[in-house]
From Swiss-Prot:
The gene is rplN. PROSITE patterns: RIBOSOMAL_L14. Keywords: Ribonucleoprotein, Ribosomal protein, RNA-binding, rRNA-binding. Binds to 23S rRNA. Forms part of two intersubunit bridges in the 70S ribosome. GO terms for biological process: translation. This is Large ribosomal subunit protein uL14. It holds the Pfam family Ribosomal_L14. Belongs to the universal ribosomal protein uL14 family. One of its GO terms (molecular function) is large ribosomal subunit rRNA binding. HAMAP family: Ribosomal_uL14. It comes from Histophilus somni (strain 2336) (Haemophilus somnus).
Length: 123
């Protein structure tokens, strides 16, 4: 469960290391975001010469949460930290060309097949 002010790790090579959620998109009073939801983030920590810089406001999709996700068979997939993949503000496609760490099968929608194909492991 991601809400405003939540700090997330970045699971791609866009140049951002750490981001903070500033808005959960989808509804006027929506409070929490789960895996597969799009959020608005600001870059808090970035590497030199990256594609994004500190202070940039971008969209991101949540790929891992500590809360986890429940499957229809009752299994719960949880992770050690919260992570997201930075998206282009207009096209909502990933800015980075590599994804680090596992992602869940819940991302298998038309919009996020690129993330699934780049990920080293899909749980």
């Amino acid at each position: 469960m991601i809400q405003e002010q939540t700090m997330l790790d970045v699971a791609d090579n866009s140049g951002a290391r750490s981001v903070m959620c500033i808005k959960v998109l989808g509804g006027s009073h929506r409070r929490y975001a789960a895996i597969g939801d799009i959020i608005k983030v600001t870059v808090k920590e970035a590497i030199p010469r990256g594609k994004v810089k500190k202070g940039d406001v971008l969209k991101a999709v949540v790929v891992r949460t500590k809360k986890g996700v429940r499957r229809p068979d009752g299994a719960v997939i949880r992770f050690d930290g919260n992570a997201c993949v930075i998206l282009n503000n207009n096209t909502e496609q990933p800015i980075g060309t590599r994804i680090f760490g596992p992602v869940t099968r819940e991302l298998r929608s038309e919009k996020f097949m690129k993330i699934i194909s780049l990920a080293p492991e899909v749980l």
